[in-house]
């Protein structure tokens, strides 16, 4: 099992884009019991990956509760970097 942050990054090499809620839904089967597996931690990981050039903002919208959802994607260079350092 990969560390949670690695799993989050690796997830973006297999999809076209996602927000924190999508990531949580996709990884909850494997990481749902982890204490650190929550929206704040996932959002922090996404923002850190964006700051480091691994992910880019793709779009944004509001959920039914009026909360902002930011969608990210891994561009070709970011995905290549992630795949180079984090193996399946």
Regions found by a protein language model. Name each.
Residues 13-22:
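Short capping segments at the starts of secondary-structure elements
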Residues 1-4, 38:
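N-terminal positioning helix adjacent to the helix-turn-helix/winged-helix DNA-binding module
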Residues 70-88:
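Short, amphipathic alpha-helical interaction segments positioned at domain boundaries
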Residues 59-70:
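Short, Lys/Arg-rich nucleic-acid/phosphate-binding segment
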């Amino acid at each position: 099992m990969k560390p949670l942050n690695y799993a989050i990054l690796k997830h973006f090499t297999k999809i076209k884009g996602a927000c924190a809620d999508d990531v949580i839904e996709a990884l909850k089967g494997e990481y749902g019991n982890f204490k650190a597996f929550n929206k704040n931690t996932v959002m922090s990981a996404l923002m850190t990956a964006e700051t480091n050039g691994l992910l880019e903002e793709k779009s944004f919208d509001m959920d039914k509760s009026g909360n902002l959802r930011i969608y990210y994607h891994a561009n070709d260079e970011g995905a290549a970097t992630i795949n180079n350092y984090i193996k399946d």
